[in-house]
């Protein structure tokens, strides 16, 4: 099947069925050009929204500038993160909301006036695991647990992470045996402090930036992410295992009754600066975030050298999603508190 011809014909049929004039097939990835911006009736807007979104997520066809556009956005985000500084302007409400968020994060992660540290070496190690993705040094080997644990080269970003993994596997006889077998086949854990950047299919217009990180780093990153997930679930009810279904329900209610709106934070993880995390989170969390992150990335395939990251992490890091969710949730609570808005969870959501 000719993918380009198929999507062109599909767009043409949809345009006619939805009541839009037939447009050139070259506009199928930018159908906004055929939509009347002055129409405000709900039925028209819904049809227009469907037409503008039905083909934009294709991963088969690609804009010739998609990769360069994604790389430029990543470089801009990294520059912004490096230049980050706290600036609340002259609005005391912003300062109050941020301070409330900081206090909330401290209460979550350092309860009982800081005498208890939720994020620590033991809690991270207990929750650590291997994920399904690829890691540095694996090459084209399968990413299943068997190969990561016992039959592939293994990498670590620092001596600390390497020694931590070597000690942690001794607590489980099966893991220790697997590591001994892996080491006999592939040698000791290699130090690889620089991550590898790649651009993965996302939509017609752009690509998703992912950084492949060392094996041992991702192992403990997922542990840190799980600890953060438990904290979120305990204090806010946010549960990553069911949250997508909840979000879909809320979006459906919002569409039907106009009581909710969804918001897409573009490149959110790329704009979480190291300075921002150091300011917002308690020190006991920041030290582990920094110890497990990959601070440099290799851009040589794109004509550049190694680059130091101003962002804490991006896609490919095991704690990225949990970290940004905790940060944004605390800030949201701070804004609600400042504006005196009660926080309520809809029934069934």
Question: What are these model-derived regions, one by one?
Answer:
Residues 1-33, 163-349:
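Core nucleotidyl-transferase/polymerase catalytic module
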Residues 1-198:
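Non-catalytic, polymerase-adjacent accessory regions of viral genome-replication enzymes
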